[in-house]
Amino acid sequence: MVPIVEPEVLMDGEHSSDVCLSKTSEIIKKCFEELILHKVDLSGIILKPNMILSGTQSKERISSEEVSNKTLECLKNSVPSDVPGIAFLSGGQSELEATENLNLINKNNNTNFIMTYSYGRALQQSALKVWSKNMKDRE
């Protein structure tokens, strides 16, 4: 059995990417403090965090390159090196955003973490939208 640790800062709100970075770092560090306190073997877990993004109601929009840089900064400063893998949440991003952001995170990855994804909505949204239509409207 592999524990999946899922701390998440939601995209809802007006927060900036810097606030997201600060709060995500704080939450991840606290999670690991507790895991270490309870003697969890960190080499046997998967971390499932959010990417560093501004809130959906924020005026700030950052590029995928900035998402990548801030997300990797957060991981390097917050996650112990014995954690083997990171499985990112899409967290309400569109299919395109989630894919572009993950692609750049992987390209820029200068950590020892194996990166992957655990997307639900970001992979299913288009199909669900089509399937929700009447058969006549699908063509």
What are these regions (language model features)?
Residues 6-16:
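Conserved strand-turn element in the central/C-terminal portion of the radical SAM core barrel
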